[in-house]
Design a protein with these regions (language model features):
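Hydrophobic alpha-helical segments of integral membrane proteins
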Residues: 7, 40, 46-47, 69, ...
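Functionally critical transmembrane alpha-helices in membrane proteins and complexes, commonly lining
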Residues: 1-48, 57-66
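Hydrophobic cores of alpha-helical transmembrane segments in multi-pass inner/ER membrane proteins
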Residues: 35-45, 98-110, 155-163
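Membrane-interface helix-loop-helix regions
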Residues: 56-110, 124, 128-141
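Hydrophobic alpha-helical transmembrane segments
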Residues: 3-12, 73-75, 94-99, 154-155, ...
Length: 183
């Protein structure tokens, strides 16, 4: 809930940040961690289900991208020939649609992360984080079109959510068992 509120607030105050130091500082603080928080939460609740991946996420991405493409052509009068053609514009995420695109990619890696975490324990989680950070750093060396670099840049946060889930579940169970006595 807090993450959603911060995203909405951040997008709202973005247009008012110039000239107001408090608003600008608030915007910077929100932007510093809100996407990382979303990615960690996405990893914490992730479940691998190929059918849902296709019927929900892929479908939502394709419909959203098609609507955005129509908006860009009709309202913004964008010339797609300058950016690689209509097919490239349709396949590559535009602006905020990148998160749906990222979730599809990240969910495809979920079985590997879960196998590392479940079979190798803490060592597997450390290895999974090292691989995720390595992928993000390596992908940062490539000049990706549009916002694709975000898919890789935020991947370690998603992996962190996936890899830390058992520890957080154990912590929640421990806290539930050791509640203070209420009078």
């Amino acid at each position: 809930g807090l993450g959603i509120l911060l995203v909405v607030l951040g997008h709202f105050i973005e247009q008012y940040r110039m000239g107001y130091s408090f608003v600008s500082a608030s915007f910077f603080c929100i932007c510093a961690f809100h996407m990382a928080l979303f990615c960690i939460c996405s990893g914490l609740v992730a479940r691998f289900n190929p059918r849902k991946l296709v019927t929900q996420q892929l479908w939502l991405y394709l419909v959203g991208q098609t609507l955005m493409l129509a908006f860009r052509a009709a309202v913004l009068r964008e010339n797609f020939a300058e950016t690689g053609g209509l097919l490239a514009a349709w396949l590559l995420p535009w602006r905020h649609i990148w998160y749906l695109y990222a979730l599809i990619f990240w969910h495809l890696t979920l079985p590997v992360l879960c196998r590392l975490r479940d079979r190798l324990g803490l060592a597997g989680s450390c290895l999974g984080m090292a691989l995720a950070v390595g992928l993000a750093l390596t992908a940062g060396l490539v000049d990706w079109p549009f916002t694709l670099v975000r898919v890789f840049a935020f991947y370690p946060f998603y992996a962190c959510g996936v890899l830390l889930r058992p520890q957080l579940d154990r912590l929640a169970a421990f806290a539930a068992e050791h509640r203070p006595v209420q009078l």
